[in-house]
């Protein structure tokens, strides 16, 4: 459905856009070139493609975000596809305002452009495949003018990447990336190339895995990638040229194809397909595997050589390639893409060749900086050690205190115990002493209650010790002393006189008592 609608859009737009194709291509060159034209020193078309890609990829530049990207892809297509591809792409891209929502307009314009590009690229698929393979190399310098090589990388990409991407990359990239977000287009455009360029450009700047780039990128360039990417990347008709193509190519169908493939093709030609999609790559590869490989190898070499010429494309490409792989990287590298636009080729190329290394170096620098703090922290650690020593001393003191407390407790315990024992011994001694002083206190006499003195009245046998034998020594005077003799009776009264008269008894009454009676 989407493919047919895209074809219809292509047909409709081709009618009106072919007339606009030439102006729109220059506009991308003008708009995208200010930023990217210089970067693509090799060929203005490459710069334009890259610039338009960046613009398209970088909605940051609202003026040329998507219309330019569309136009730039057309420009790239112009080289690859003289008017048809450029016209459909430019009008479509213009009409399909990438800035607005690259999704439908871009998809349509891209669809139209893609359909045309598919038709024309299909016609030139072998060309595009070879140019695409050689994206930056020699193979299709005129057709594939990429950042890698003026015409070969880009146009070839426009054809191969674009034809397949125009359907899928442009539509998919314009739609998918626009769908994703202008930032993703920008960031993906720049970051796909940069993010993946750091990975693939730096990692594979020379590497570009030629075989892979032919395989994957060629596959991506071929129509199969378009269908696959349209299906795989986006439901959009020709949006899934690459999962990454959608991200990388969407940001810059031409630039991703061109820039990405010049840089990432020769650098990461395989990486773009890799990043984009194994399936897409596989499908694309069957279509033009060998030519792409050959061209990819050549383009890889060319792209490596024209890195100065294709710095912008390379950088945008490197930022864009990682888009689907690392959207975060895309966003992070969007500024780089913008920077490359403004600074044009030199920063991107330097970034392409160096960015990964530069990130690595900064990371190393950061570790160095961290190391310095670590050294400081080491010094702090020494201080901490001192503190620990102090703590240890305090701990020793504290430990001693607890031990002293324990010793004191033990001393108190023993002291208390000794005191109690002493008290008990003293009491016992006092008791014994008191017992000695009162020897009979505990003895009972045989008579129970009779005092011993009472029994002394009756004389007893001195040798009768039964009753008197005391347990202890008894003083002799007590035992032998006899009670004093009773006093003699008083003398009796003389008998009454016999011969006289009897004594008269007087009543003792008050009357009879004398007056002086008391």
UniProtKB/Swiss-Prot annotation:
Residues in compartment: Cytoplasmic: 431-518
Residues bearing carbohydrate: 124, 156, 188, 220, 268
Keyword Membrane applies: yes
Positions in the Extracellular compartment: 20-409
Listed Polar residues bias regions: 168-180, 187-207, 248-270, 276-285
Annotated GO CC locations: Golgi membrane
Main location as per UniProt: Golgi
Transmembrane segments: 410-430
Region spans: Disordered: 38-377, 477-518
Keywords: Glycoprotein, Golgi apparatus, Membrane, Olfaction, Sensory transduction, Signal, Transmembrane, Transmembrane helix
Compartments where located: Golgi apparatus membrane
Feature: compositional bias, Pro residues: 138-153, 482-499
Biological processes annotated in GO: non-motile cilium assembly; protein localization to non-motile cilium; sensory perception of smell
Secretion signal, residue range per the UniProt entry: 1-19
Annotated Basic and acidic residues bias: 92-106, 209-220, 236-247
Function as written in the Swiss-Prot or TrEMBL entry: Required for proper function of the olfactory system. May be involved in establishing the acuity of olfactory sensory signaling.
Protein name: Golgi-associated olfactory signaling regulator
Organism of provenance: Homo sapiens (Human)
């Amino acid at each position: 459905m989407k493919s047919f609608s895209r074809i219809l859009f292509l047909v409709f737009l081709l009618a009106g856009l072919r007339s606009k194709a030439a102006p729109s291509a220059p506009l991308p060159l003008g708009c995208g070139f200010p930023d990217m034209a210089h970067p693509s020193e090799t060929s203005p078309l490459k710069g334009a493609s890259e610039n338009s890609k960046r613009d398209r990829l970088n909605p940051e530049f609202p003026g040329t975000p998507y219309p330019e990207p569309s136009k730039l892809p057309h420009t790239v297509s112009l080289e690859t596809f003289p008017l048809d591809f450029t016209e459909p792409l430019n009008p479509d891209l213009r009409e399909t305002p990438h800035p607005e929502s690259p999704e439908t307009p871009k998809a349509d314009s891209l669809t139209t452009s893609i359909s045309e590009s598919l038709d024309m690229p299909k016609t030139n698929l072998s060309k595009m495949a070879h140019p695409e393979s050689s994206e930056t190399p020699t193979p299709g310098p005129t057709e594939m003018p990429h950042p890698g090589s003026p015409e070969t990388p880009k146009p070839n990409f426009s054809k191969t990447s674009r034809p397949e991407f125009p359907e899928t990359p442009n539509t998919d990239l314009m739609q998918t990336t626009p769908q994703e977000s202008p930032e993703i287009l920008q960031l993906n455009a720049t970051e796909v190339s940069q993010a993946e360029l750091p990975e693939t450009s730096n990692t594979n700047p020379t590497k570009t895995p030629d075989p892979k780039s032919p395989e994957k990128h060629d596959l991506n360039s071929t129509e199969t990638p378009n269908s696959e990417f349209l299906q795989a990347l986006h439901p959009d008709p020709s949006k899934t040229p690459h999962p990454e193509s959608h991200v990388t190519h969407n940001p810059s169908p031409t630039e991703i194809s061109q820039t990405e493939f010049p840089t990432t093709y020769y650098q990461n030609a395989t990486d773009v397909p890799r990043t984009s999609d194994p399936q897409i790559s596989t499908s694309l590869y069957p279509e033009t595997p060998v030519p792409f490989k050959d061209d990819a190898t050549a383009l890889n070499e060319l792209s490596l050589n024209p890195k100065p010429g294709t710095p912008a494309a390379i950088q945008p490409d490197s930022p864009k390639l990682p888009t689907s792989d690392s959207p975060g990287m895309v966003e992070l590298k969007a500024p780089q893409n913008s920077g490359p636009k403004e600074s044009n080729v030199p920063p991107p190329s330097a970034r392409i060749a160096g960015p990964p290394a530069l990130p690595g170096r900064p990371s190393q620098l950061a570790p160095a900086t961290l190391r310095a703090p670590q050294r400081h922290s080491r010094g702090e650690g020494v201080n901490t050690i001192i503190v620990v020593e102090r703590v240890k001393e305090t701990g020793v003191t504290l430990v001693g205190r607890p031990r002293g407390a324990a010793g004191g407790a033990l001393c108190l315990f023993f002291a208390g115990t000794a005191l109690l024992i002493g008290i008990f011994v003293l009491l016992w001694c006092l008791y014994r002493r008191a017992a000695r002083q009162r020897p009979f206190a505990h003895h009972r006499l045989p008579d129970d209650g009779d005092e011993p003195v009472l029994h002394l009245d009756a004389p007893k046998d001195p040798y009768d010790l039964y009753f008197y034998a005391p347990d202890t020594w008894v003083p002799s005077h007590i035992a032998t002393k006899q009670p004093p003799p009773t006093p003699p009776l008083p003398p009796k009264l003389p008998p009454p006189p016999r011969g006289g008269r009897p004594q008269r008894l007087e009543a003792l009454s008050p009357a009879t008592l004398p007056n002086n009676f008391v």
